[in-house]
A protein has these predicted regions:
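Metallocofactor- and cofactor-centric catalytic cores in central/energy metabolism, strongly enriched
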Residues: 1-223
């Protein structure tokens, strides 16, 4: 349905449609600055699009928008507050639709739609008798893959052979929030520690065997 909404052909296998969707999104990201984004055109409300065009803040490709907006902040490039405000709003539209909304939809397709369910939370999910792996950052793809691997008997055996009771994947900060929205807890995907503020306490617990950082929001400290 998401591919169809963007005007991507849904004929063929699931893998073929997925590749076509990725190609479409990538092409839109790299669209020229003065070439309107097809993603924004497809997803934004009609009345908003009309206003954005009137204000000249309907964005092109997000990569060009980022370069245009950030370079405008350089000395003697654009010091007029109204112009900078409009560029910030234009970049905001691009980020909301081409980055955040598309990213969430794609994660929903891959891992399921978020639904309410029970989840173990806080530092009590960390048990020193287990090998505790914490994916940390903003992109849950690594974390989901770790859960899939940890559920396989061979990876559990590696932990027990080393003297632990087993291997657990513990969700953490933004990556963890994406994970716990979509997948229910079990003996392997055990729970959620908390948000960014708890990161030092999590590491100070001495229960973390692997702090798997996918990108930002990972403190540059040595446990």
């Amino acid at each position: 349905d998401f591919a169809k909404r963007l005007g991507v052909s849904t004929s063929g296998s699931v893998d073929k449609v997925a590749i076509q969707l990725c190609d479409f999104v990538e092409a839109d990201f790299n669209r020229k600055l003065d070439e309107p984004s097809k993603i924004v055109e497809a997803l934004a409300p009609k009345e908003r699009k009309e206003l954005w065009r009137k204000l000249d803040i309907f964005p092109g490709g997000i990569h060009g928008e980022i370069m245009f907006a950030t370079s405008s902040c350089l000395t003697n490039v654009d010091g007029y507050y109204q112009s900078l405000a409009l560029k910030a709003m234009r970049l905001g539209v691009a980020m909301a639709y081409q980055s955040q909304i598309v990213n969430e939809y794609c994660q929903d397709v891959l891992y399921g739609i978020p639904r309410p369910h029970k989840m173990r939370v806080d530092l009590g999910v960390l048990d020193p008798d287990y090998v505790n792996v914490l994916p940390n950052g903003h992109e849950p793809f690594l974390g989901f893959t770790m859960v899939q691997l940890a559920r396989q008997p061979e990876w559990q055996r590696k932990a027990t052979d080393a003297g632990a009771k087993g291997l657990r994947i513990i969700a953490n900060i933004e990556t963890g929030q994406e994970m716990i929205q979509r997948w229910e807890m079990d003996g392997t995907f055990y729970g959620f520690t908390g948000n960014w503020i708890m990161q030092e306490a999590v590491l100070a617990s001495g229960c973390v065997d692997l702090f798997a950082c996918d990108m930002n929001c990972s403190m540059p400290i040595d446990p």
